[in-house]
């Protein structure tokens, strides 16, 4: 389509960015672990507990720095996810039903099976069961970054399969957060949020293409959603769906412009900051029994085994029932490798974990992070090895 940046260039830039940011995410997580397990641990905890307040008239928002990161910065991350989902649905791979069936089926399996495994392991503990959604998430930056390390050894169709699967997985995570991880609701704030949403929709329908007005109303929407009891990050998704992809003269795309501007900030600043703030697990007093506790065990097994069985299993079923075909040029070994890579939950799992087990108010807050880091690490290493070996055999064949 004329006026819109070609899908191929967006796709190439996307993978280049995610591959580089994945290394930064790892560095941020490792740095957090080192600092929080050193004599400087008091600085780490103290920094995240620093109170930050914003007051405008009667409106007062006071939170520790950690919650500003999780509720504020991550709203921009979800804004970017929403922009990517809308672009793919309107003018990308999610706009063609035939191309959606396989990754959508795989994504469903990759959410249901890990959740069932976690529930089964923690079924006798109602408080621990609250973390059932933690192993259902996939970190799109890490998963695509690891796959990008294989370069041209994997077909583009396989990368598209993983990207589409991860986007659908993110959409599923958004729905889960909205339905299961919202607090006590405020009817007044919800009505104000609905009014903001109506204004955004009206602006879209009236052909407003300047991003400024959308950002201003979006900020007000975020405040209303924050005060409503619904998780504030969902305001980013709602705003994204109202940003126009196309304009009447087709000379520019507000959505693509915003996506282009946000991508480096999210990849190189927001996600690393989030990883640093949430990955600092204290290893003091940790033993083998700590890893075999039902919470970290459920998360680790859910990510590593559940994702693999769910994604690979339902992909196999869809292909055998002739509902869809394998990505062009990809073999079953590569599909298995990608299924394992989907077990890299990291940032998304950490985010869901912060909702299920709030830091400072839940005894499982550190345990969930331990399971996430363990499961994600082994999923990355094993997934890379399996995909690399399968790609070598495919190339030889």
Swiss-Prot record:
Pfam families: Na_H_antiport_1. It catalyses: Na(+)(in) + 2 H(+)(out) = Na(+)(out) + 2 H(+)(in). GO terms for molecular function: sodium:proton antiporter activity. The chain crosses the membrane at residues 15-35, 42-62, 65-85, 101-121, 129-149, 160-180, 183-203, 219-241, 265-285, 299-319, 335-355, 370-390. One of its GO terms (cellular component) is plasma membrane. It is found in: Cell inner membrane. Its main location: membrane. It is a multi-pass membrane protein. One of its GO terms (biological process) is regulation of pH. The keyword Secreted does not apply. Keywords: Antiport, Cell inner membrane, Cell membrane, Ion transport, Membrane, Sodium, Sodium transport, Transmembrane, Transmembrane helix, Transport. Na(+)/H(+) antiporter that extrudes sodium in exchange for external protons. Belongs to the NhaA Na(+)/H(+) (TC 2.A.33) antiporter family. PANTHER family: NA(+)_H(+) ANTIPORTER NHAA, SODIUM ION/PROTON ANTIPORTER NHAA-RELATED. This is Na(+)/H(+) antiporter NhaA 1. It comes from Pseudomonas putida (strain ATCC 700007 / DSM 6899 / JCM 31910 / BCRC 17059 / LMG 24140 / F1). The gene is nhaA1.
């Amino acid at each position: 389509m004329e006026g819109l940046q070609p899908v191929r260039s967006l796709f190439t830039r996307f993978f280049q960015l995610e591959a580089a940011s994945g290394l930064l995410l790892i560095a941020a997580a490792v740095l957090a672990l080192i600092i929080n397990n050193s004599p400087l641990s008091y600085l780490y905890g103290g920094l995240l507990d620093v109170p930050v307040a914003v007051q405008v008239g009667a409106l007062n928002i006071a939170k520790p720095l950690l919650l500003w990161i999780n509720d504020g910065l991550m709203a921009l991350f979800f804004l970017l996810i929403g922009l990517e989902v809308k672009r793919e649905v309107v003018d990308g791979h999610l706009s063609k039903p035939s191309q959606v069936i396989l990754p959508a089926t795989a994504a469903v399996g990759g959410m249901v099976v890990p959740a069932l495994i976690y529930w089964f392991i923690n079924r006798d503990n109602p408080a621990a069961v609250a973390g059932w959604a933690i192993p259902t998430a996939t970190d799109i930056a890490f998963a695509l970054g690891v796959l990008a390390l294989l370069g041209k050894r994997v077909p583009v169709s396989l990368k598209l399969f993983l990207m589409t699967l991860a986007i659908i997985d993110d959409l599923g995570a958004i729905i889960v957060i909205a339905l299961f991880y919202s607090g006590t609701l405020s009817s007044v704030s919800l009505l104000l949020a609905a009014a903001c949403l109506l204004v955004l929709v009206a602006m879209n329908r009236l052909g407003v293409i300047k991003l400024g007005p959308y950002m201003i109303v979006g900020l007000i929407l975020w405040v209303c959603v924050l005060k409503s009891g619904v998780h504030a990050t969902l305001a980013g998704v709602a705003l994204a769906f109202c940003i126009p992809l196309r304009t009447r003269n087709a000379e520019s795309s507000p959505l693509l412009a915003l996506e282009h501007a946000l991508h480096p900030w999210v990849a190189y600043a927001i996600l690393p900051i989030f990883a640093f703030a949430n990955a600092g697990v204290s290893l003091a007093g940790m033993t083998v029994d700590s890893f075999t506790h039902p919470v970290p065990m459920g998360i680790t097994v859910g990510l590593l085994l559940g994702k693999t069985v769910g994604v690979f299993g339902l992909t196999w079923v869809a292909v055998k029932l002739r509902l869809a075909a394998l990505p062009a040029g990809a073999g079953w070994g590569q599909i298995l490798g990608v299924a394992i890579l989907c077990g890299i939950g990291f940032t998304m799992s950490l985010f869901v974990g912060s909702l299920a087990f709030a830091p400072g108010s839940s005894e499982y807050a550190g345990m969930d992070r331990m399971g996430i880091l363990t499961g994600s690490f082994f999923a990355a290493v094993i997934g890379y090895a399996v995909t690399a070996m399968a790609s070598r055999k495919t190339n030889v064949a």
